[in-house]
Regions:
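Compositionally biased terminal segments of proteins
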Residues: 1-236
Length: 236
């Protein structure tokens, strides 16, 4: 299952027509998958590559990596992690979405990709890691914020029950209201994960007219409270 920045990039390509006009494609230097050691072994075998697994005393979230040479002669690395930082493996696995990647030769490759909303949570969680406050990480975070409403619009166009999309909005609310990294991003960088909310005329009127304003008001109240706490500490 594809996770990390490459999942954000794949979703950006898949949902391009649902994203704001002019939004630049996001890239990723890494190709990360969620998987156990057996998955790493299988990948190395299928690709004719080399297998690397952490030693017992290695402090790493990786379960291993497969290094192989692609069809153009370039060495590539696939990193496998037990779970994305800040997320739970079983939840990521349960909510992953199957897509098909169109190849230049006309083939379509099936691929499981981390859910767009979990991509957002992953990008937010990563901001707490050393070395993850880079310009590239910021672009990936900004892109992930836009992916969630884009995915919601896609679901509505596909005729999916609007309640699925309102649940996405509730997940965004939970992230903005309770996640300490999301709060820090708002306070320190002005990054608002509530921009991932979708207000669409196809959603129930009660959700648009009542629930969304409630969400914004409750998060604003919590942010004001946090600012006041910080200010009092500064005065002390």
């Amino acid at each position: 299952m594809l996770i990390g920045g490459q999942a954000v990039a794949i979703w950006g390509a898949q949902l391009m027509t649902y994203l704001p006009a002019g939004q630049a494609p996001v890239t990723s230097r890494d190709v990360d998958f969620q998987g156990e050691r057996s998955d790493v072994e299988l990948a190395a075998q299928l690709l004719g590559g080399r297998l690397y697994v952490p030693r017992f005393d290695d402090v790493t979230p990786q379960t291993g990596k497969a290094v192989f040479v692609d069809s153009e002669g370039y060495e590539r690395t696939l990193d496998f992690l037990a779970e994305p930082h800040g997320l739970i493996a079983e939840d990521v696995r349960r909510t992953a979405v199957p897509i098909r990647i169109a190849m230049e030769d006309g083939r379509e490759i099936p691929l499981w990709v981390m859910h767009p909303e979990r991509c957002l949570r992953s990008r937010v969680a990563n901001t707490s890691l050393p070395g993850k406050r880079t310009a590239l990480a910021r672009r990936q975070l900004d892109a992930a914020i836009q992916l969630v409403p884009a995915f919601g619009r896609f679901l509505l166009d596909e005729g999916i029950d609007p309640r699925v999309v309102t649940k996405l909005n509730e997940r965004v609310f939970e992230l903005a209201r309770y996640d300490k990294n999301a709060m820090r991003l708002w306070l320190e960088d002005g990054i608002d994960v509530l921009d991932a909310l979708l207000a669409d005329d196809r959603l129930p009127e009660a959700h648009r007219a009542t629930r969304l304003p409630q969400i914004r008001a409750e998060v604003a109240k919590q942010r004001d409270h946090r600012r006041a706490v910080i200010a009092r500490r500064g005065d002390g």
